[in-house]
């Protein structure tokens, strides 16, 4: 299993949690997938700050599989499919998927939470590409 680290699309670095006391905060992180993604590989993305409320998680893929085997889920340590359900096929064709699991909207935790994208199926015919992970959260629900 490989672990990839996404970086903030604006700064090119990994960053800790941050939020705006009013309104909402949006972040987009990106990672190049130059090698074949296999089932169990994980991409570490943005951090949802403690005591904030999740509005949405978005994951965008270029077509990283000219076959049809690449699937993923999105969540956090201990609950990897908390935001986007296990087996999503977007990496096999490219596109964008939003949070689609009950309880994702309004998710909150008492500690900073790193968003994780985990492959649940291996690419049949791997293609180098890009995965972008976006989060939107607010301090006031």
Predicted regions and their residues:
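Surface-exposed, low-hydrophobicity beta-strand/loop segments enriched in small/polar/acidic residues
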Residues: 2-141
């Amino acid at each position: 299993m490989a672990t990839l680290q996404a970086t903030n699309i604006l700064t090119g670095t990994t960053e800790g949690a941050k939020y705006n006391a009013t309104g909402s905060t949006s972040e987009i992180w990106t990672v190049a997938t130059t090698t074949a993604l296999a089932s169990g590989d994980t991409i570490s993305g943005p951090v949802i700050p403690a005591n904030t409320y999740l509005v949405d998680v978005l994951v965008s893929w270029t077509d990283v599989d000219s076959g049809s085997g690449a699937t993923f889920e999105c969540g956090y340590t201990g609950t990897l499919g908390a935001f986007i359900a296990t087996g999503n096929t977007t990496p096999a064709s490219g596109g964008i998927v939003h949070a689609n699991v009950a309880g994702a909207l309004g998710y909150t935790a008492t500690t900073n939470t790193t968003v994780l994208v985990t492959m649940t199926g291996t690419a049949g015919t791997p293609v180098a590409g890009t995965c972008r992970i976006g989060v939107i959260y607010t301090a006031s629900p």
